[in-house]
């Protein structure tokens, strides 16, 4: 009987302690200037590709980190412009400028695909895959 009371007490405490998952917002908190459109799953670690001649054409690349996730391209107002091919748990994304490919020079977005253990490479600013399905790394 004692175990039943302990179980009931523990359940009650857990229920009440988890009822509000967000910390209260302070009155003097700084509000974001722009918020991107929401994605279905966990998102973080954005990268910004800066257009070489017109900064207003720069884009934000963010990850949707679930099994059916991908890279998302946003304009500077936070509107989704494009989604990459489906990636299996993409992780962080980074931008590199001036990669020599044959006679061309391109900018790239690079992410890891955790479920396939591959590096994925996309040409910028079109977010097109250029890695023939990924580069195995593990």
Model-identified regions with their sequence ranges:
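Sec-dependent N-terminal signal peptides
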Residues: 4-13
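C-terminal motif of bacterial Sec signal peptides marking the signal peptidase cleavage site
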Residues: 15-17
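Blade/loop signatures of beta-propeller domains
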Residues: 21-31
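A short beta-strand motif characteristic of beta-propeller blades
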Residues: 31-39, 80-85, 131-138
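Beta-strand-rich domains and repeat architectures in extracellular enzymes and scaffolds
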Residues: 33-69, 91
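Short coil turn/linker residues within repeat-based beta-strand modules
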Residues: 67, 75-80, 126-128
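Blade-loop segments of beta-propeller domains
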Residues: 76-117
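Asp-box/WD-like beta-propeller blade repeats and closely related beta-sheet repeat scaffolds
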Residues: 115-138
